[in-house]
Amino acid sequence: MSEKATEIANLLGPTVESLGLELLGVEYLPAPGGATLRLYIDVPLAEQPDRIINVDDCERVSREVSAQLDVEDPISGNYTLEVSSPGVDRPLFTLDQFARHVGESAKIVLKLAQDGRRRFQGQIVRIDTEAAAVVFSVDGKDVQIGFGNIDKARILPDWVALGLAPQKPNKPGPKKPGHDKKKPSNEPAAGKPRAE
């Protein structure tokens, strides 16, 4: 998270927790016409999977946080507030969140290139808490990436496990007229005499 996003997360976290929810992280996206402030919320880990985040939860957080932002005013200028569930491709904002998803695949974007790359995709192997780093298996090799160098990270959903993998058609689709692949022949059609 950016410094501004971290500041806002620290400010709003207790408000979200007071509603019985968890603030996973904040995205602050400044733009010339007005910034976007996106909050990702979820139910506490202890209540999963019995309870999931819903639209009512997002609306409650939006109302409470909006009022707090009006009073505290941490953002100058216009902005749009969005409150969202993390979704199946959930973003990861903290080392604890990476630790919850060890064994799953993720894609990450770095602030500064490492090994000539800024984008990596691989399986989360472990968290090195002493080094404040995440170890990924990328192309069969372990790669350690400092948490402070991670700009963005998202879980890659396992669509097969979710039962949402694209299905291959069992039979070919209908033929389009005029697209017959047979080559024209000078032979007469069977049973028809050739006109002389």
From Swiss-Prot:
Domain of life: Bacteria
Matches recorded under InterPro entries: Ribosome_maturation_RimP, RimP_C, RimP_C_sf, RimP_N, RimP_N_sf
Main location: cytoplasm
Pfam families per record: DUF150_C, RimP_N
Record family assignment: Belongs to the RimP family.
Subcellular location: Cytoplasm
Basic residues bias spans: 173-182
Biological process according to GO: ribosomal small subunit assembly; translation
Species per Swiss-Prot/TrEMBL record: Xanthomonas campestris pv. campestris (strain 8004)
One GO location term (cellular component): cytosol
Stretches for region Disordered: 164-196
Keyword Phosphoprotein: no
Keywords associated with the record: Cytoplasm, Ribosome biogenesis
Protein name in the entry: Ribosome maturation factor RimP
KW Nucleotide-binding (keyword) present: no
Primary role: Required for maturation of 30S ribosomal subunits.
